[in-house]
UniProtKB/Swiss-Prot annotation:
Modified-residue entries (N-acetylmethionine), positions: M1
Bilayer disposition of the protein: Lipid-anchor
Binding site for GDP: G52, G54, K55, T56, S57, N155, K156, D158, C159, A187, K188
List of residues that carry Phosphoserine: S21, S25, S106
Lipidated residues (S-geranylgeranyl cysteine): C243, C244
Organism name: Homo sapiens (Human)
Name of the protein described by the UniProt record: Ras-related protein Rab-12
An example Gene Ontology CC term for this record: autophagosome
Species lineage: Eukaryota, Metazoa, Chordata, Craniata, Vertebrata
C-alpha cells in the first residue's frame, strides 16, 4: 500500500474509516485466527536422581528458559508441560520432577510406570550422587516399564574446575545398562538441555509402531480432558533387571 495514501486516510475527517471502507465492509477483510492444531501424542517423562543434582533446573531451563541459582528442593513431585514438534508430529510433553530424598520414594515411584522416558541425573562435582546411581537403577527396574527410554545426564558442566566424576566414568556406567544413552549438560549455561529432552522424545517416537505414527486418530492421540494431578496406582514390582 502507498504510505502516502495510508497517511491521507488517517488525516481525513468525518469518515476515513466509515462503512464504505473496503477493508472493513461486512468484516470480510478480517482474517480469522486459526485454532492451534491439537497435539498428536502426550508423552510423560520423569527426572530422577539424588537431591541437589539440578533436576528442577534442567526442567525449568527446558520448559521456561529460566534458571534459579538457589532453587528449593522438590517436595514429592512437580511437573511442567511443553509442546514440541518432531517427525511431523506435535507432542505434548509432560515432565515430572521428582524429589531426591528417600522419604519420598513411596510417592515418586508411582510415576515410573506411565513414563515413556526416564532422565537419571547426577552432579559431576559430587561423587556421592554418582555413587547413588545403582540405587536409582533399582527403582527403575522395580517400577518402570521395560520399554522406557533411559538417559543418564551428568549435570553442572559449568563447574568443570570442581569436577569429581570424569566423562569416561559416566559413559562407562551408561554402557553397562541396556539401551541407556549418556550426555553431560549445564542447566545454568543452557548447554545440551534442549538436546537432552528432544533426543529422548525422538528415541521414544522411533520405537512407536508405524501405524500409530501415521494414524492421528489412534488411541495415543492427546485427550482434551484435564490433565490428571493424582499419581497412578503404584505398580507391582517387575522381576526383570536391566543391569548387565
Amino acid at each position: 500500500m502507498d504510505p502516502g495514501a495510508a497517511l491521507q486516510r488517517r488525516a481525513g475527517g468525518g469518515g476515513g474509516l466509515g462503512a464504505g471502507s473496503p477493508a472493513l465492509s461486512g468484516g470480510q477483510g478480517r482474517r480469522r485466527k486459526q485454532p492451534p492444531r491439537p497435539a498428536d501424542f502426550k508423552l510423560q517423562v520423569i527426572i530422577i536422581g539424588s537431591r541437589g543434582v539440578g533436576k528442577t533446573s534442567l526442567m525449568e531451563r527446558f520448559t521456561d528458559d529460566t534458571f534459579c541459582e538457589a532453587c528449593k528442593s522438590t517436595v514429592g513431585v512437580d511437573f511442567k508441560i511443553k509442546t514440541v514438534e518432531l517427525r511431523g508430529k506435535k507432542i505434548r510433553l509432560q515432565i515430572w520432577d521428582t524429589a531426591g530424598q528417600e522419604r519420598f520414594n513411596s510417592i515418586t515411584s508411582a510415576y515410573y510406570r506411565s513414563a515413556k522416558g526416564i532422565i537419571l541425573v547426577y552432579d559431576i562435582t559430587k561423587k556421592e550422587t554418582f555413587d547413588d546411581l545403582p540405587k536409582w537403577m533399582k527403582m527403575i527396574d522395580k517400577y518402570a516399564s521395560e520399554d522406557a527410554e533411559l538417559l543418564l545426564v551428568g549435570n553442572k558442566l559449568d563447574c568443570e574446575t570442581d569436577r569429581e566424576i570424569t566423562r569416561q566414568q559416566g559413559e562407562k556406567f551408561a554402557q553397562q545398562i541396556t539401551g541407556m544413552r549418556f550426555c553431560e549438560a549445564s542447566a545454568k549455561d543452557n548447554f545440551n538441555v534442549d538436546e537432552i529432552f528432544l533426543k529422548l522424545v525422538d528415541d521414544i517416537l522411533k520405537k512407536m509402531p508405524l501405524d500409530i505414527l501415521r494414524n492421528e486418530l489412534s488411541n495415543s492421540i492427546l485427550s482434551l480432558q484435564p490433565e490428571p494431578e493424582i499419581p497412578p496406582e503404584l505398580p507391582p514390582p517387575r522381576p526383570h533387571v536391566r543391569c548387565c
